Swiss-Prot record:
Protein name, as recorded: Villin-1
Lineage of source species: Eukaryota, Metazoa, Chordata, Craniata, Vertebrata
Originating organism: Sus scrofa (Pig)
Residue list for modification Phosphoserine: S366, S735
Family annotation (PROSITE patterns): HP
UniProt subunit comment: Monomer. Homodimer; homodimerization is necessary for actin-bundling. Associates with F-actin; phosphorylation at tyrosine residues decreases the association with F-actin. Interacts (phosphorylated at C-terminus tyrosine phosphorylation sites) with PLCG1 (via the SH2 domains). Interacts (phosphorylated form) with PLCG1; the interaction is enhanced by hepatocyte growth factor (HGF).
Gene Ontology BP, a term: actin filament severing
Amino acid sequence: MTKLNAQVKGSLNVTTPGVQIWRIEAMQMVPVSSSTYGSFFDGDCYIVLAIHKTGSNLSYDIHYWIGQDSSQDEQGAAAIYTTLMDDFLKGRAVQHREVQGNESEAFRGYFKQGIVIRKGGVASGMKKVETNSYDIQRLLHVKGKRNVVAGEVEMSWKSFNRGDVFLLDLGKLIIQWNGPESNRMERLRGMTLAKEIRDQERGGRTYVGVVDGEDEKASPQLMEIMNYVLGQRKELKAAVPDTVVEPALKAALKLYHVSDSEGKVVVREVATRPLTQDLLSHEDCYILDQGGLKIYVWKGKNANPQEKKEAMNQALNFIKAKQYPPSTQVEVQNDGAESAVFQQLFQKWTVPNQTSGLGKTHTVGSVAKVEQVKFDATSMHVQPQVAAQQKMVDDGSGEVEIWRIENLDLVPVESKWVGHFYGGDCYLLLYTYLIGEKQHYLLYIWQGSQASQDEITASAYQAVILDQKYNNEPVQIRVPMGKEPPHLMSIFKGRMVVYQGGTSRANSTEPVPSTRLFQVRGTSVNNTKAFEVPARATSLNSNDIFVLKTQSCCYLWCGKGCSGDEREMAKMVADTISRTEKQVVVEGQEPANFWVALGGKAPYASSKRLQEETLVITPRLFECSNQTGRFLATEIPDFNQDDLEEDDVFLLDVWDQVFFWIGKNANEDEKKAAAVTAQEYLKTHPSGRDPETPIIVVKQGYEPPTFTGWFLAWDPFKWSDSKSYEDLKAELGNSGDWSQITAEIKNPKPDVFNANTNLSSGPLPIFPLEQLVNKPAEELPQGVDPSRREEHLSIEDFTKALGMTPAAFSALPRWKQQNLKKEKGLF
């Protein structure tokens, strides 16, 4: 087992995106049929390779999954093969350790229809998942709201609780029982899994029935079957609350240096949050502890080979030393092939030798390179991915209405002040644009840095009222002063001016400064603004253009590093600042009065600026909730439009903007708390995010291309064609002849047990226990079937000998029945 065998290499596809699975059999990797992906035996270990494609780049994740009843040898083999596969991929993969019952969201996300965990394993004769087999009796406990995992539990009412979904699988019939406290999404996921079992394992020849626990009387025949199989029910157990992970734990980062240079492994804490990339040395290995929730191991490319080889063991030893649960998730990161999730635990992440445009050497929170596309307004709706990267829904030529907050109310801004934004004010801007014949709206909420808290609160309140006036269709964009997005600037065609403070109100008594200095940034009408800075020489920068307005004249100061396009745009915006003739001043040739106006010469930034970074980021989607009174965000890996559920709210993080998507059936409290929830996300982000990051609220059905462009193949008609839980339940309810199925189940074959089976009245004669236990076949009484000794027992003797009722015994997999009979001398 020192290298990947030829069979594995032959079956290994490293160029096609998707999932490949192997099972450990006799210490070898054996490919699993794709028709059974999503089914795992708890007595086995598996290796799952996931390949992702971003642009032209491929990335790899290797997960090894440990069943709760697997052997130590199998677990060790899975870990070794994971390392060998990573070596085969030249260290480009992220390794994950997955333990049954505590699988990562990334792992669950590969199996959109759900995961089914079965009893048994290859060592006990369970070679594969049988299809088109109806000789089945099992109870599946379905857990999870989004990517579900269903595990076999004891086939008894004792296994049920009020808060979860259960599938009673009887071969020709699957009954889904929904706990009265389960939610619609959990029920829908359970139904999807039931249909998957029906279609994939039974060729569509199994009936599916649904019982809602709060209204069992509506399904009398299905309840009759359940009580027949499971026995009469007693009081149901209370709902088991889902595990809640505090955001503070996710943000609790500690970095440890790992070394064995002295002959023994030494783990030493070197830093806590916030973390910076320069803490990681290429010559060493590190452990990053995320509040005990997940352990990352980072392997420097020049680290000791033995240290790198032992990375996973180091993590497991660390977990033991910290007394964390054995099921704690572990990821091994290779130097240069880190996942986006790992990178975003750091304040800033540099990708060496990656350029996009002249002089750009790195991107924030990114591993993907995206080709820069020249702005073309006509492409925004045809190519929403371009709109997403450019952050533009169009070229800003739509209709505009602007209001200022005055006395906590909305007052229209006079035309002469349109484009002027004062730091002491808050503004609402409604932008209307067309896609085809349909009107769409953007509602910008601009909040000055010196505005009062009452005005900021009023701006949010007035935005809600305006939103309702337009039938909740506008996309709301919160813009803190200084964070103006490109599209907002494009509306003013290069004439946007932002003042440090003050107001444009007619009755203002605030004095206007006699000298003002504005820094101008931008190369076109779509990205230019002038931003007021302190009127002193230290504010200057050789890379930019500045407008200096005095009582007597207006200077246009051009730094040596500015371009011709920047000079042209500066002339345009300068006309907005002052109507007087502009005196162009080249850096180094300033007249004396220029320095007098700035209070005298002083040193200023004159080093050449690196090319402006265009952020190329890895977008991340989170399902959000505050139902427990605490903000929770669950990441959805490899997301697509199907992950956006109508009952929920979601957060799409594209680093320099945060979108908050609201489903039409979302909780009212969550709708109202959208902006607050997004701000809480930024505050609790492990990397220490800028709390002033713009927040954009998007409603289902009114998504702008700047949002849809982050999703592959967005379908605007998706929700109009989708089926609700009630629709699917109605369909399934019409599929079964329950009376015929009930008759078949209540008159089973002789070798099928249920809670009401009376063995003494069956076709087989009854004998005392001592005549059947540990007896060779030739010594058994006449009439005894040696392979069915347990069926010749009275119920009392059966329970005494096997330690369970016949119904519980019949619920066990055949391999477990056989093992138990051997153990008790009845085989």
